[in-house]
Amino acid sequence: MALIVVILMISIIVVIALQMNRTSRSEVYDAANLRDRVRLFYVAKSGFSLGQVLLREDRNSFDGLNEDWATTNKIVLPTDSLFSARGELRLVIEDESGKIPLNKLVNGNDINMDVRDMLIRLLGQPEFGLDKNRAQEIVEAIKDWIDTDDIVTGGGAESSYYSSLPKLYAAKNGPLDCIDELLMIKGISQGLYNGSTGRPGLKDLVTLHGGGRININTAPKLVLRSLSQDMTVEAVEKLDKHRKTSGEDLASPTWYQKVIAGIAIDTQLITTRSDYFRVSSVGASGDMRVTVTGAVIRDHNTKKTKLLSWKAE
């Protein structure tokens, strides 16, 4: 009997020891993961600071796709010495001034017809698969989300619509604070917002920032097509090729007139200088990654940058 008790006690001790060993190894693994994640955060944050330096060091009188800050997507910096697995830093700087400024759609309760028309033309392009009426309804819903009244605009929506949904909420009745607020607006689906294979994402073509003028040197091709009802795919391809291969002649907003004929763009809608940028820096090691993203405004006279918003994930 005593032998059986001893054997049982030994078995219990072995099980406990194995469990403690497993727990200890798990804690060590978790600690290593936490250490690497902290390191990745600082790697990504350093990349974000590097992006701001590149913007401050830009001395050109205009902004284009061939500048140092615009080609950071080609930069991959190894950080292997900091991690047990391969590590790297990736940096991308996007020109927010080349996108359509959503918050300029409304001034108080009045609609900005120039921005409205650009958005309708943008959403009406074949890549989005929407007809003109549907595109207009979505723009009206964005307008209703931002304006301060509760009057429904055409096919738009106010709080009366949103309060009838399974997860009820009210219309913002104020400027958009983050781009993913668009997903709360009537008519904007995940597919429209994010895009998919062969389809663009609305989030990549619009911005919360900007004074209302769009930089034609950096605007995505779909945004270029929305600048005029006469703009064609062929004309945009010519403009895109020219701005990627030309130099100083991109300083004037009217340079496009030398490349395409018979298409007029309102000069009040375009510029060749940019003030707002989005910096995205990724620190990665193995399957782990940390991204620091933020919006930055740059003063053209002092070349100083100011952080408007940022997040780490």
Specify the residue positions occupied by each region the protein language model found.
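Compositionally biased linear targeting/interaction segments
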Residues: M1-E313
